[in-house]
Regions:
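Secreted/periplasmic carbohydrate-active enzymes, especially glycoside hydrolases
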Residues: 1-220
């Protein structure tokens, strides 16, 4: 089973003037100057830092990952003073495997930059490029055999439905890290299993699917 611990409290933020303050996430340093409608809000690099204890896990059968759901716009992540990853793009999730890098007590530092650079587009627009860690940060413990976490921050699962002649075919493609048997179950709104398939490229078929029909029949 997967366990997730949020790292939202007890962060130290070092701003553009070099001063440090305690903050909780989500946080942006443009909360005030980014609201006045002008384009003179501060853009550059600031730093976030927090401490956490290593989670309990079995190194033989489990892995530990850090997950960032949104850091705008570029991020460099350091664990115990060592750079472990960098990410460009403020609107996408990214993760990093840290099992072998953990100590008993750990210091996580994130250098965040919302300045103009040639790696992220658009570089200028009629909206504010808020700088900061504005979505959740999590510590995840997962089995070694798991749905992929390191594939560009996505879920590791692609679902493609096709409807023809009142029947439905659903393709479920899953990226898997490790070994194991992958099973897919499709449930109806009442929790009943209506279709099953096995494998990383599973195909499900429904003879009489109950379709969603807007306000007339909003079935999900």
């Amino acid at each position: 089973m997967r366990s997730i611990a949020k790292l939202m409290q007890n962060w130290q933020f070092t701003g553009p003037d070099g001063s440090t303050a305690a903050v909780v996430l989500p946080h942006t340093w443009n909360a005030k100057d980014g609201q006045d409608g002008g384009n003179d809000y501060w853009r550059g690099t600031c730093t976030y830092s927090t401490a956490f204890a290593a989670p309990a896990f079995d190194a033989a059968s489990q892995q530990v990952w850090l997950q960032f759901e949104g850091v705008n716009s570029s991020a460099k992540v350091l664990l115990n003073g060592r750079t472990i990853c960098a990410h460009d793009g403020g609107y996408s999730t990214f993760r990093v495997h840290i099992s072998e890098l953990l100590e008993k007590d750990n210091r996580l530092t994130v250098e965040v930059d919302n300045g103009i650079n040639d790696r992220i587009y658009p570089q200028k627009a009629d909206f504010t490029f808020y700088g900061g860690i504005y979505r959740d940060v999590s510590l995840m413990v997962v089995p070694k055999d798991h749905i992929a976490l390191g594939h560009f921050g996505d879920t590791g699962v692609k679902i493609t439905p096709a409807l023809k002649d009142g029947k439905a075919d659903i393709r479920v493609e899953t990226l898997v890290e490790g070994e194991g048997v992958l099973s897919v179950e499709l449930l109806d709104a009442a929790g009943n299993i209506v279709a099953t398939a096995d494998g990383a490229d599973a195909k499900l078929h429904l003879e009489t699917p109950h379709l969603w029909d807007g306000v007339k029949d909003p079935y999900l």
